[in-house]
Amino acid sequence: MRTPFITAGALTALLFLADSAPGQAPARLPPVNGLDEFMAVPEDNPLRVDVILLGRRLFFDPRLSRDGTRSCASCHNPVRAFSDSVPLSSGVGGRRGRRNAPAIINRGYGTSFFWDGRAASLEQQVLGPLQNRSELGAALPDVLARLGADSSYRAQFAGALGVAPTASALARAIASYVRSIRSGDSRADRYFAGDS
């Protein structure tokens, strides 16, 4: 039953950030018991509400998959604590993956990604599932062409990141959204904040 609280926490953080006017200094997520210092946020991708909202839109958009049937949220379902409930996740065409989808709550605090640790940042990680044939199975040029053909996406990319849809901009936006998905008040959060 913690899922509604986690989702509410993520939405509260987004609403807090929405108070920032365009052109202002990057807004920060509300501190989570003093844990901000542990979040790895690249200098070239500070947490900003407009980028997070673009990332959220992309995260839930099935057009990122090869056949338009799956999105990041298909396996990282907010109703299931941003995970899924099966031992092996399935991707486009019902293909079974080799592992289940890990929960992505608090992944902004991570320092390595994928089961083998091959990605050192969320920006590096997010493009992997998009192109993996057992997950979203898309060709990156095709995804970028679909996004570029959508005038609302072109406007949102330009407004948030100052560019047309590119692989780097796509990765930065989704990574920002994933960083905004935080639990906020677990026992571990309180421990790291010094409340033992």
Map each language-model feature to its residues.
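Periplasmic c-type cytochrome electron-transfer domains
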Residues: 3-5, 19-196
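Bacterial N-terminal signal peptides
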Residues: 7-18
